[in-house]
Amino acid sequence: VIVPPEGYLKQVRELTDAHDTLLILDEVQTGLGRTGTMFACEHEGVVPDIMCLAKALGGGVMPLGATVATRKVWEKAYGGLSKAVLHTSTFGGGARACAAGLVTISKLVEENLPERARDLGEYFLNGLRTLQKSYKTIKEVRGKGLLIGLEFDKPVEGLLDKLTAGAINEFAKEYYASLVAGELLGKHQVITAYTLNNPNVMRLEPPLTVTKDQIDYVLNALEDIFSQRKGLLRMALSVVTKKP
C-alpha cells in the first residue's frame, strides 16, 4: 500500500498526452469509494482513457469485472461495423452480475459511501498513528480512505538482536505481519492479511459500511497484541496452537 506523492498521476497524464499514448488505470482495488472518492484518480482530477474495475463492483455477492473507456477509445474500437467484432469476449454480459453492479453503484452514490470512507479512513489512520507513537515495531502507517497499510520494523531489539547478528529481524520481515494477523484472527476474530509484494506490511481494508465502534475494536485489538510484547516464538506458538 504505497500512496504516490501529490501530482504524480497528473505528471503521468501529461506524459501520456505528450506521447499520444493511452493512460490505462487499474482501479480494481482502489476504485468504487475505497480511497475516499469514487475512483482514486479523482484525488488529482485525472481522467484515464481506460479503467479496469472488479471486486467491489459486484457488491460482494457476484463476481464482476469491467473495462471502462472514454467515448473516443470506444468509438475507435467499436465505432463501425467493420470494427465491431475485433474485440470480443467468450464469457461476458452476465445479467445477474451486471444487475448487482448497477445496484452497487447506486448504493455507493445514494449512501455517500466514498465520503464515508474518506472520513472513517482519516479516523482509522489517526488511531493507528497514535499507536505508532507507543510501539516502535510499527515502522509506518500509510494509506488513503479505507485502504491502509501497516508496516512493521524490528520487533526484536537489544542483546538478542545483536547475538543473532540481526538474523532474527530478517526472519521477522517475512513473518511478523502474518503473525500479527494470526493473533487478530485467533484472539479477536478480525480478518486481515499481509500484502503479497511486502510480507512485512499488513493491509487493513474494512468494508465501507464499517462503524467507528468497529474501528475502535480493531485499534484496541492491536493495542492488546503489541502491549503484550510477545517474542516471535511465543507469538507463533499462540497462533498455531489456538483452538477454533
Functional labels for PLM-detected ranges:
Residues 1-244:
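Conserved N-terminal phosphate-binding loop of PLP-dependent enzymes in the Aspartate aminotransferase
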